[in-house]
Amino acid sequence: MEKTYNPQDIEQPLYEHWEKQGYFKPNGDESKESFCIMIPPPNVTGSLHMGHAFQQTIMDTMIRYQRMQGKNTLWQVGTDHAGIATQMVVERKIAAEEGKTRHDYGRDAFIDKIWQWKAESGGTITRQMRRLGNSVDWERERFTMDEGLSNAVKEVFVRLYKEDLIYRGKRLVNWDPKLRTAISDLEVENRESKGSMWHIRYPLADGAKTADGKDYLVVATTRPETVLGDTGVAVNPEDPRYKDLIGKFVILPLVNRRIPIVGDEHADMEKGTGCVKITPAHDFNDYEVGKRHALPMINILTFDGDIRESAEVFDTKGEESNVYSSEIPAEFQKLERFAARKAIVAAVDALGLLEEIKPHDLTVPYGDRGGVVIEPMLTDQWYVRADVLAKPAVEAVENGDIQFVPKQYENMYFSWMRDIQDWCISRQLWWGHRIPAWYDNDGNVYVGRTEDEVRQENNLGADVQLRQDEDVLDTWFSSALWTFSTLGWPENTDALRQFHPTSVMVSGFDIIFFWIARMIMMTMHFIKDENGKPQVPFHTVYMTGLIRDDEGQKMSKSKGNVIDPLDMVDGISLPELLEKRTGNMMQPQMAEKIRKRTEKQFPNGIEPHGTDALRFTLAALASTGRDINWDMKRLEGYRNFCNKLWNASRFVLMNTEEQDCGFNGGEMTLSLADRWILAEFNQTVKAYREALDNFRFDIAAGILYEFTWNQFCDWYLELTKPVMTGGSESELRGTRHTLVTVLEGLLRLAHPIIPFITETIWQRVKVICGITADTIMLQPFPEYNAAQVDEAALADTEWLKQAIVAVRNIRAEMNIAPGKPLELLLRGCSEEAVRRVNDNRSFLLNLARLESITVLPADDKGPVSMTKIIDGAELLIPMAGLINKEDELARLAKEVAKIEGEIARIEGKLSNEGFVARAPEAVIAKEREKLDGYAEAKAKLIEQQAVISAL
């Protein structure tokens, strides 16, 4: 094996070999239990980020673990067409490169442009997924707009429509005036903002007066531009100030519309003036009030968010109405909505109807992609009746057919599902699944899989002109069918029979409503088992937290703190990293701040660490459901782990290759260390399997690290040296056999988390073991063998380790060179301790670097010594001739003085009010941590001074 571990040399060729050999495919053995994971499809034109790397590491670990247990495994891969996101990217691209809009192209040519863009950049993310070592079946790769999935989408739409679970209606939606499309509640980002509350007088009609004799009501609003669309004023029916006015009218300022005063509990007596203007076409709460009181709906805005030239007036059913005039005052027509706000406030003020303006803290809805203020807008949209679909989906989680890990996410799921609103599924975009609905010239709607089917089913001749609905479906509509459409539905395929329901879904909690809930609803409605019982899409939902930067900040391009997982695998120079973080920024003014932070954090760029180190780090940080702060030091630590495993394997191979390791017979004697490591290994297997079975990848990674680094490398390899240098033939055979057996088992154990290094080493080790199989990934996963857990060997070895560590600690405390042989005295020994010393004298002499071991009588004071107490014995190391008392005390005094200087410096900092007020919380915490560390170090040095003074 190469002297040093270079992941760059082994990872890509190895992955290509795996893929070429077809190792990632299901084994096709239907007698075996199947295990299937559906990858959450990333955006087809996107690139891999840390969230992907994190979730995919977890999924690949599970898939490799189950594959090694002989299960028929499928990790289904695919990408998402990502409607709004992809359309925006291509629109920006043609604007920047050609100065054109999508309208210059026209629908068909623009869609062709997107397909072209997908062909050019769609492979980036799948190439990156290969670099992570993902063992997905690439031959089954799907795309949410491939022919099969498009057919599944049409099938679902048509069936739901025929079951009256999809309908078209004029309702209020979140409208993004920049993207000119409806967006879902989940795509709205509510931001806190400082605004104003305008108090406007609405004159009472017909000579009516308030209880205190006023001839007007004062209405408070944060959106005065919507006054033009008011169709009522609500007061609380219990409000003594206004209840006698219910049923009377006010005259709406500026448009002189006569609108009713209604009694509704939506009006809060304690809030504002107690009078609320009702604009059903431009506010979600007002829409509900309007429905309750049959108030007409007046739309005053265009799809761009400008004031219309004439309003649209509808009744509560959404049908056109002439109950009110559609006239809008000429001075407000065509004004942009926020310009209209100023103009309307000025006009109201000029009429003497502006009572006051108060500062007001408010929550403003923004579109998370378009980045502009969202308008509630009355539009024709397609909806899914969600309550019908939600009922069985709630029951599936209640009765345990689907389990959330961690369990607390069930509450989040229930709270949303039990109060579910109808789902608006239409989007005013061009890229996506076009809605399979057609209209004739009379406005009749026909739904079918194709236009031909529509004509046939409805007996429409060629003379009837039909035009297809212009809208496309919400991206999440096709994603909701992901678990079954990818397996060939609506056909009853073998894949669907073998792999559905799938086993585990790995997802971030941020898309629990967008995706998880909708998959459960859609799957249970369309997929039934042979008894007609609805099938769940998956049995377990494993929720992950978000990956944040080292300060706990969300990673984002605008903060310049994004870390590309492949930069940690391959490394990146500082200039390249700076260009990546500051090039093409939406907010170029942030570039300098980002540059400074990056230079401080990565002065030499990022070193290459290899895929396995990245995967190990991600697994180790995967504590269920909690957000994760990324830690470069952990990554370095796991790269060191890979180096340690490599070097340990080289040691094993150097001592076993072309040697008699007992695989072809011959007597074998196992040393205490051999019996101990076999026991340790089996206990590790048991705990590790339990952790993986319970989705505790962090615990599994910790168990693997502890056994490999501490037990196998640091202890066992050292404990083999006495046998290797002076053992009999049968002892040598036993130790070599154990070395190879444990290493081979360890490689299989570690393979799901760190596949590349384990496969590479295993290819050498398998030869010694006489294994002829081609790849580690199809080898059986290690199983716990209770017969190999030798309790006596465990107890004896732990005692020897205690003794060796005690001697090493005395060396360190007394500053004695590691290679200097020492005399060891033992006093007050139990019979067990004496037996252990006598049975394992050569181990102790070798590993503790001792020249002699003497057991003293219990009452023997012995010479002046440093002592340590261990189980059943007191250890003494005589100090005569080992240290110069005066020199050692002088050295310790110097150390104490140095530490006291550091303590004074930090205490000074922390007592400086200016520093404490300005410094971030994390910096202060770090300084306090340092202070505690120095205080502890000082206490230890003072303890040592006391011991040496007493010598």
Curated annotation (Swiss-Prot):
The protein's matches in Pfam families, at most eight in alphabetical order, are given as:
Anticodon_1 (PF08264), tRNA-synt_1 (PF00133), Val_tRNA-synt_C (PF10458)
Q: Which residues form a coiled coil?
A: 880-944
List localization entries: Cytoplasm
Find motif ('KMSKS' region) and give its ranges.
554-558
Q: Which residues bind ATP?
A: K557
Q: Where is this motif: 'HIGH' region?
A: 42-52
Q: Name one GO molecular function term.
A: valine-tRNA ligase activity
In which domain of life is the source organism classified?
Answer: Bacteria
Which residues are listed as membrane-spanning?
none
GO BP terms: valyl-tRNA aminoacylation
Where does the protein principally reside? cytoplasm
- EC numbers, comma separated: 6.1.1.9
CDD domains to which the protein is assigned, alphabetical = Anticodon_Ia_Val, ValRS_core
Q: Which reaction does it catalyse?
A: tRNA(Val) + L-valine + ATP = L-valyl-tRNA(Val) + AMP + diphosphate
Provide this UniProt record's keywords sorted from A to Z. Aminoacyl-tRNA synthetase, ATP-binding, Coiled coil, Cytoplasm, Ligase, Nucleotide-binding, Protein biosynthesis
**Is Acyltransferase there in the keyword field?**
no
Q: Enumerate the PROSITE patterns for this protein.
A: AA_TRNA_LIGASE_I
What are the GO cellular component annotations? cytosol
Q: Which family does it belong to?
A: Belongs to the class-I aminoacyl-tRNA synthetase family. ValS type 1 subfamily.
| Domain remarks in the Swiss-Prot or TrEMBL record | ValRS has two distinct active sites: one for aminoacylation and one for editing. The misactivated threonine is translocated from the active site to the editing site.
NCBIfam families noted in UniProt: PRK05729.1, valS
Subunit note:
Monomer.
Among HAMAP family, the record links this protein to: Val_tRNA_synth_type1
Give the protein's function: Catalyzes the attachment of valine to tRNA(Val). As ValRS can inadvertently accommodate and process structurally similar amino acids such as threonine, to avoid such errors, it has a 'posttransfer' editing activity that hydrolyzes mischarged Thr-tRNA(Val) in a tRNA-dependent manner.
Q: What is this protein called?
A: Valine--tRNA ligase
Record organism: Salmonella typhi
